């Protein structure tokens, strides 16, 4: 089997590349290594995953941009069996600062990958890495109850795939990812391509170089270890379901191996793998023996108070469920950060 993974140097992409390389697939990763320019952090950390993947002989690394037709066609080569499109601009605050760049990467980049794949590998399975942000502020219309350390849904366990995506605000990031989501659906309908759309909740794992704009799970651990201050936007009671990257990739694999022609799945840790920011900080203290320096600020636009994925659909249809608990996953990430402390300034 031959697989192309866009955004192969990112958290999701690098975990996917390693996962399938270990299964003896021929893996091609495409990445422009431009995260440092978008987010303004150290380029050395951006290239860590790129170098890490170099240890696998069956991973071919190509520096290129998903917006460039020639780059994508070159990565596709004579054809592939699977495309995992994880490349993207992943930060909500960044999308507000540079909306044109955000749209160019997330919307046009996705369309370019779809069209190039249609021309060179029309029978390939395409996995699109979408996001819960496609639901926008509709999430905030759900009734909540406030408890000591977290908010909880008043009358539901989680968000399913029938949640509305329109008639609400999204942020530029939510709009650009929804555009890619809809285009991927359309390529399934009009061109009969096999496509799986995974609307991800909070994904984390080893080799995650988090910072304030993106990757908060890793950022909180890194900041605590390096004695850097963190800002809590809101009251810290906001809740997310966490999913370790390896578990996410198993979900992709389940779809790839299935007979489904098209599917849309909310994917995350589900109601059994949730944490609030305040609870997460308590967990950090248990692991590192200290708490981060914290300040509180106003809520950020479209920052959902609670987002928990209803994963019953993917459980039923693909037989998938998380294996790595939040406690175990956070320890894995924390151990990796401590071991690689020198990479964090």
Positions of PLM-derived features:
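C-terminal "lid/loop" region of Rossmann-like NAD(P)-dependent oxidoreductases
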Residues: 235, 264-265, 278-281, 289-306, ...
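Hydrophobic alpha-helix immediately C-terminal to the catalytic Tyr-X-X-X-Lys motif of short-chain
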Residues: 179, 183, 187, 220, ...
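N-terminal Rossmann-like NAD(P)+-binding domain of SDR-like oxidoreductases, especially those catalyzing
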Residues: 1-203, 331-332, 340
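Hydrophobic "lid"/C-terminal helical patch
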Residues: 16, 252-256, 284, 330-337
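Conserved C-terminal active-site "lid" loop/helix of NAD(P)H-dependent oxidoreductases
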Residues: 245, 264, 300-321, 328, ...
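Glycine/proline-rich active-site loop of Rossmann-fold NAD(P)-dependent oxidoreductases
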Residues: 178, 191-194, 203-219, 226-228, ...
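Conserved mid-core alpha-helix of short-chain dehydrogenase/reductase
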Residues: 71, 112-115, 242, 247-250, ...
């Amino acid at each position: 089997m031959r697989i192309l993974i866009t955004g192969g140097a990112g958290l999701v992409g690098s975990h996917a590349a390693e996962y399938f390389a270990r299964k003896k697939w021929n893996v091609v990763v495409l990445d422009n290594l431009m995260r440092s320019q978008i987010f303004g952090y150290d380029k050395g950390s951006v290239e860590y995953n790129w170098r890490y993947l170099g240890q696998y002989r069956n991973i071919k690394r190509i520096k290129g941009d998903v917006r460039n037709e020639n780059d994508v066609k070159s990565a596709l080569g004579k054809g592939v069996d699977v495309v995992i499109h994880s490349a993207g601009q992943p930060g909500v605050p960044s999308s507000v600062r540079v909306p044109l760049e955000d749209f160019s990467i997330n919307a046009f980049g996705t369309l370019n990958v779809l069209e190039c794949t249609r021309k060179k590998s029309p029978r390939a399975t395409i996995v699109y890495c979408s996001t819960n942000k496609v639901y926008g502020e509709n999430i905030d219309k759900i009734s909540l109850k406030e408890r000591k350390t977290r908010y909880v849904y008043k009358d539901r366990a989680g968000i399913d795939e029938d949640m509305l995506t329109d008639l609400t605000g999204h942020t530029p990031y939510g709009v650009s990812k929804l555009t890619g989501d809809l285009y991927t659906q359309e390529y399934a309908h009009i061109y009969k391509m096999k496509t799986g759309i995974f609307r991800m909740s909070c994904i984390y794992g080893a080799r995650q170089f988090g910072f304030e704009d993106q990757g908060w799970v890793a950022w909180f651990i890194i900041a605590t270890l390096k004695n850097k201050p963190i800002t809590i936007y809101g009251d810290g009671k906001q809740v997310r379901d966490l999913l370790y990257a390896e578990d996410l990739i198993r979900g992709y694999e389940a779809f790839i191996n299935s007979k489904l022609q098209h599917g849309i799945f909310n994917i995350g840790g589900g109601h059994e793998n949730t944490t609030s920011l305040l609870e997460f900080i308590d967990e950090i203290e248990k692991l590192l023996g200290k708490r981060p320096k914290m300040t509180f600020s106003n809520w950020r636009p479209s920052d959902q108070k609670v987002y928990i994925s209803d994963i019953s659909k993917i459980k039923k249809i693909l037989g998938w469920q998380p294996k790595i608990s939040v406690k175990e996953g956070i320890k894995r990430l924390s151990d990796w950060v401590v071991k690689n402390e020198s990479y964090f300034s």
